[in-house]
Amino acid sequence: MSGLAAKQVFLRNFCKNILTSERLSCYNLVGTMANSAAQQKLNQASMEPFLETYYTSSNNYEIPLNFLPENLTCESNMQTVLGTNACVETPMFLMDKYMSDKQKYKAMRQWIRFKKEKLTSNSEESFILRVLSFNILAQYLLETYPFLYKAHDKQALSWKIRRQLLLQEILGAQANVICLQEMQEEHLEEFLVPLRELGYNYLYKKRTNDKKDGLLFLYRSDQLILIDYAKVELYQSGIELLNRDNVGIIAKLAVKKNPEIQLVIATTHLLYNPRRHDVRLGQTQLLLAEIERIAFLENTMTGAKYLPIILAGDFNLQPHSGVYKFIVEGVFEYQGRGKNLERTDYRFLSNSLIPPRLCITDNCQHFNVLKQRLRGEGTDKVMLENSEHHNVDTSENNSSNVCEVKTDTTDFQTIEIAHDYRVNFCSGTLTHPFHFNSVYKHQNCHGEQEATTNQGKWITVDYIFYSDLELLEVYDLPTATRCNTLPTIPNFAVGSDHLCLAATFKLRKSKL
């Protein structure tokens, strides 16, 4: 077949099923075909995203994404995107890289099902929910710390390339709820375009102060209703332990066809500093207090009852470290430990983690909220600062808790709110009322460690925790050994320096 005939056949068939503005991005590659093997590779490379779209197990994913943006199909435009000093390779060579990397990556990521029932079997009593969590790597952080990406293929670091790869993986998961970390604010609107077309609504919370990225929480508005939410700032002025710009988003959702089926989903991105586990513990205490406030249903004879909860994100901590144990075990004694939350003979933590003036108990509950619930007294005012609202006044003259919570001391104190119900401050031990499990077990059946990112070596720092839900399937994580066979991420298959996490749950109606 002549080159002209090949182009005509390619265009006639290629344009039938393409819905995006970048449908001709592979067109210029056709002219380079010199033999049948090359022609076959082109057909495979150009049509694979579309074949995946139409032969997927669900028809909900309707926007096919092509790999190479249109303006990257010639060397001059590629130099514009990547910089004049970038080493530019031919589109065919890039396509070879893409196919090789993607095939390796796809072989590592499989959906593992635990239940035999159909994943579309929604009923009046239950709903099948899929959640995806992904740290997508803010471009400005990549460019601010280029020394971290010296070993990477520079052409895979372009935002235009990474955005396509990220969206391809995110949309391909067909999740009802998507939790993204490191969503750069200036890239938000363009990133939302295909997601809005598929019916996703969103919440966005930028990190505080001068940070340029934040959290993006998306949910399918044709399936879920947003009932309540909180955008949580983990920065609290005047508190050394809480002077970092991390944030959280908490959403209370109901199933649109049956609003009595509800749950709470939260996402966060905790402090990175590997030495400051104590900071992450304090951030977690604050975040869990807000989750407790939103997820609460009622008090019963056996204690408080809560909605099902999912907590997902980049926690910047490894499995079985102090904060991890606190989340899954519900209790952690920090007094006498070092800032890494390990036992130490020097510079150990005292009995006080965060100051009582925030009115958050050692059981990760807001004191004001508890008083309102148990006594019907006062207001349920939360004593946390938030730059999106008027800052709270924590002075003694204006605090409704001054008579009960001693806010000017770090001494241990216990307060009886109701008969046989006491709360503690500065006890040296944290607890929380939830029963979290991790979706991932962090090692495979052979004892090999799973991984979500590479920080000098492949480790796990990203998690999906859940309570009172039935886990149906999980998007399997590769082991560190298998990850080492991939080109350093981001690459031409993975658009971030983290791997995405996803799981499918059965959500049942809460029984009151």
Where are these regions (language model features)?
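Active-site-proximal segments of metal-dependent phosphoesterases and phosphodiesterases across multiple
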Residues: L270-A289, H320, I327, V331
